[in-house]
């Protein structure tokens, strides 16, 4: 999909001139925005034309009203129109479709970087991964922090990320580098200190436009909204929310999955016990600073058994299932059996450990 880099129109779908009082007035009255209003507001934010008070008011009012999938789609599309572009056509020609494994953050649980570990395992299983991420949101160490501690350079530009994807099977898009215009909202978001609609935009704005994903959402009431955005894109995505609050597929209890495929959304309850996993305790999955989490990554990839490995295998399998969903012939249970087997084999064979070593070398040499 090609997005225009031009700023959004200053008029609404009805032809009226747009303004902050008009947009904020609808939101504070609990009314959904009309078509184009969310895009206009995000355009103001991304071009530096919105004042911090306007950005904060928009973010909080949108949260209190509860955003619709249409509104969030407009916000994400404007963000993507301002993002640095990856050569997606060349990527698809070389390796086919890709998958993202990411979460909103904000669950406050301070777990290890499960999505980062799962991404490495998925790539080692032969599924191309382009991950979009940032530094810590609510934990001591975000995915970017842990990758740095492992020796992976996170400051690669679009061509370098594309080359990493082609050569190694995995690439990392560091959000501040690929979304420089988002800096206007980022500072305000952190000052607000409570989750808003901005917290769900990261996983929706991967500049490589992967068509598949395992996307975690810490906010149960917004997970279905995210699923609606992916459905409109006709992506194959599992939007997941651990019923313990994690923005991952959890092993401590059940998870809720919004399965997005062929433009439809199905809501499911997923219990890992049915696939042979033991119940874990949240304490088993706790992380630490970047060095501590990097050590846990190395241990899992070296073959260490236990709750962290179980959670990594489960989430890696979920991403493989989402990728399989790009085919209209994919079946749910067989896809899970295949995904779990491939994820386990990627670790046990040493392939995941070797892929990380190659990724570190490649990123340091480009």
From Swiss-Prot:
Record keywords, A-Z: Amino-acid biosynthesis, Aromatic amino acid biosynthesis, Glycosyltransferase, Magnesium, Metal-binding, Transferase, Tryptophan biosynthesis
Binding site for Mg(2+) 2: 247-248
SUPFAM superfamilies documented for this protein: Nucleoside phosphorylase/phosphoribosyltransferase catalytic domain, Nucleoside phosphorylase/phosphoribosyltransferase N-terminal domain
Domain of life, source organism: Bacteria
Associated pathway: Amino-acid biosynthesis; L-tryptophan biosynthesis; L-tryptophan from chorismate: step 2/5
A single Gene Ontology CC term: cytosol
Enzyme class: transferase
Subunit structure, as described in the record: Homodimer.
HAMAP family named among the record's database cross-references: TrpD
PANTHER family reported for this sequence: ANTHRANILATE PHOSPHORIBOSYLTRANSFERASE (PTHR43285:SF2)
Function comment: Catalyzes the transfer of the phosphoribosyl group of 5-phosphorylribose-1-pyrophosphate (PRPP) to anthranilate to yield N-(5'-phosphoribosyl)-anthranilate (PRA).
Protein name: Anthranilate phosphoribosyltransferase
Taxonomic source organism: Mycobacterium leprae (strain TN)
Taxonomy of the source species: Bacteria, Bacillati, Actinomycetota, Actinomycetes, Mycobacteriales
């Amino acid at each position: 999909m090609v997005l225009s880099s031009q700023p959004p129109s200053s008029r609404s779908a009805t032809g009226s001139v747009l303004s902050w009082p008009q947009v904020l007035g609808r939101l504070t009255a609990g009314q959904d925005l009309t078509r184009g209003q969310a895009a206009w507001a995000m355009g103001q934010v991304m071009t530096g034309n919105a004042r911090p008070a306007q950005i904060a008011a928009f973010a909080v009012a949108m949260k209190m009203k509860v955003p619709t999938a249409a509104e969030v789609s407009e916000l994400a599309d404007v963000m993507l129109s301002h993002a640095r572009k990856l050569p997606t056509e060349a990527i698809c020609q070389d390796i086919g479709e890709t998958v993202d494994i990411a979460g909103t953050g904000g669950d406050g649980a301070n777990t290890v970087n499960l999505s980062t570990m799962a991404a490495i395992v998925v790539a080692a299983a032969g599924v191309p991964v382009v991950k979009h991420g940032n530094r810590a949101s609510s934990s001591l160490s975000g995915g970017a922090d842990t990758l740095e501690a492992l020796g992976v350079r996170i400051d690669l530009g679009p061509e370098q990320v594309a080359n990493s994807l082609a050569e190694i099977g995995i690439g990392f898009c560091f959000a501040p580098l690929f979304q420089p215009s988002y800096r206007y909202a980022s500072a305000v978001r952190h000052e607000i200190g409570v989750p808003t609609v901005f917290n769900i935009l990261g996983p929706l704005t991967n500049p490589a436009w992967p068509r598949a994903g395992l996307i975690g959402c810490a906010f149960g009431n917004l997970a279905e909204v995210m699923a609606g955005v992916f459905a409109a894109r006709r992506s194959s995505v599992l939007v997941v929310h651990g019923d313990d609050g994690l923005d991952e597929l959890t092993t401590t209890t059940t998870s809720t999955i919004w399965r997005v495929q062929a433009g439809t959304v199905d809501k499911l309850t997923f219990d890992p016990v049915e696939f042979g996993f033991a119940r874990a305790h949240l304490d088993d999955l706790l992380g630490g600073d970047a060095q501590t989490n990097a050590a846990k990554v190395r241990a899992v990839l070296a073959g260490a058994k236990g709750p962290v490995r179980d959670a990594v295998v489960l989430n890696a399998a979920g991403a493989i299932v989402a990728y399989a969903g790009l085919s209209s012939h994919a079946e749910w249970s067989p896809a899970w059996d295949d995904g779990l087997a491939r994820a386990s084999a990627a670790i046990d064979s040493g392939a995941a450990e070797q892929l990380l070593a190659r990724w570190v070398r490649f990123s340091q040499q480009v």
